[in-house]
Amino acid sequence: MHEVATTVSSAEMSSPPVAESWCYTQVKVVKFSYMWTINNFSFCREETGEVLKSSSFSSGPNDKLKWCLRVNPKGLDDESKDYLSLYLLLVSCPKNEVRAKFKFSLLNSKNEETKAMESQRAYRFVQGKDWGFKKYIRRDFLLDEANGLLPDDKLTLYCEVSVVQDSINISGQSSSNNLKVPECRLAEDMGYLWENRRFTDCSLFVEGKEFKAHKSILAARSPVFSAMFEHPMQESRKNRVYIRDVDPEVFKEMMRFIYTGGTPHVDKMADKLLAAADKYALERLKVMCEESLCNNLTVENVADVLILADLHSAEQLKAQAIDFINRCSVLGQLGCKDRKNCNSNQTMDIMETAGWKSMIKSHPHLVAEAFRALASAQCPPFGIPRKRLKQS
């Protein structure tokens, strides 16, 4: 017979299972105690098997279960003749049976409980049935005055009883969790804050156009703005910032990104927006612009895009532009007229474009890089930047 080992993950162990229905069972237990004092214990009969019984007792006046204690001062039989035997006896019971646990102890001369012994489980009692300990305590130990168990020749027995009563079941159906957490509206709320200029504390001027903003938000989103407001510069003292080399519409789109993390018009101004993102250290916006430019590379614009990527250290875009040039050059040498491979609507060679000719004069190092890459090109698949966009 083979056993199949299964592994339970820590996550499965930490989260409790959920059931469609459930039941809670309450087992009622009645607890009570009884004390029995046997005076002049040393005069008790010494014959093995002889019995002393206490009066009957119960948990209360309305309890129909009656109990008593039974003692064999010199043991129940020959095996236990050197011991005192002690039992709990069910005297009367209206039921067929009852289950109970019990604990016996002696009270010493200081009225302290000692020599405690208890049942390990709830035993089944029927009327006239008893349970207990045949060898409860050795007689010589009990009779030794030094042990203080028979003060004034009195044996005091203390009994605690726990009777199991009827159980009660409470059941029901689990209600499914119908709570629906609303979608996060942080971007919309921040956009509303930006559009409505509420609680603004600084002004940004772009070609004479004023933009109201919040310094804390600008500082949290842009390391450049953070340094600007943190240090005792003119912008920090007067809460007025003059933005240069950025078109107002481009700046507005950049501010929308700062507040909301989105830029719906990136494809219309990706080149200028990339420059602004680089200037204000908005890394995620910069990669978004790289992605847009990469998706829209053409034979006519690839040289300009390569220059832009080099100028603003957009390394992913730069690599993609060089790959594009290499691919189109290789396909051109093979006589391929599949315009889709070059993402172009013209068959004009890249090196004949005005952008390429301008790059030869203004950025000859890029031409050299393109040719070096072409010489060792393995024609890798063309795709969008591989760098994952960071969450705003």
Swiss-Prot record:
Subunit record text: Homodimer. Heterodimer with SPOP. Component of cullin-RING-based BCR (BTB-CUL3-RBX1) E3 ubiquitin-protein ligase complexes containing homodimeric SPOPL or the heterodimer formed by SPOP and SPOPL.
Any GO MF annotation of the entry: ubiquitin protein ligase binding
Location(s), subcellular: Nucleus
Gene3D superfamilies referenced in this protein's UniProt entry, alphabetically: 6.10.250.3030, 6.20.250.50, Apoptosis, Tumor Necrosis Factor Receptor Associated Protein 2, Chain A, Potassium Channel Kv1.1, Chain A
Name of the protein this chain belongs to: Speckle-type POZ protein-like
Function of the protein: Component of a cullin-RING-based BCR (BTB-CUL3-RBX1) E3 ubiquitin-protein ligase complex that mediates the ubiquitination and subsequent proteasomal degradation of target proteins, but with relatively low efficiency.
SUPFAM superfamilies cross-referenced by the UniProt entry: POZ domain, TRAF domain-like
Family, as annotated: Belongs to the Tdpoz family.
Domain BTB intervals: 200-267
Keywords from the named record: Nucleus, Ubl conjugation pathway
A GO CC annotation given for this chain: nucleus
Gene, per the UniProt record: spopl
Example GO biological process: protein ubiquitination
Listed pathway(s): Protein modification; protein ubiquitination
InterPro entries: BTB/POZ_dom, MATH/TRAF_dom, SKP1/BTB/POZ_sf, TRAF-like
Domain MATH positions: 31-161
PROSITE patterns linked: BTB, MATH
